[in-house]
Amino acid sequence: MTTVLDRVRTAARTRVLYLPHAVKQMALPERLISAAEVEDVVLHGEILEDYPEDVRGHSCLLMGTPRGRPVHVVCSPRAEYLAIITAYLPDLAKWSPDFRRRSD
């Protein structure tokens, strides 16, 4: 059985498409998240949340620590490509200290 993480990584090896929202969020001066960091999260990170019923299509939230900092990436695997919906640096006010669970 193919997992969503397998589908994400297979799609990423085919082609990666950064949606406009992702590009805008990655370019914010306080974030400056590179495409290399996003690709590191996609290829080596872990799934934190799975959104099978997302209106944009099945998507998920991944986390990794490229360059020693936590990065969250929301992406959606498609047959022809991996859509990067957004990428951001998680905020301790909204996430647990390990950045893996949302705060209450």
Report each predicted region and the residues it spans.
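Ribonuclease/tRNase effector modules and their secretory precursors
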Residues: M1-D104
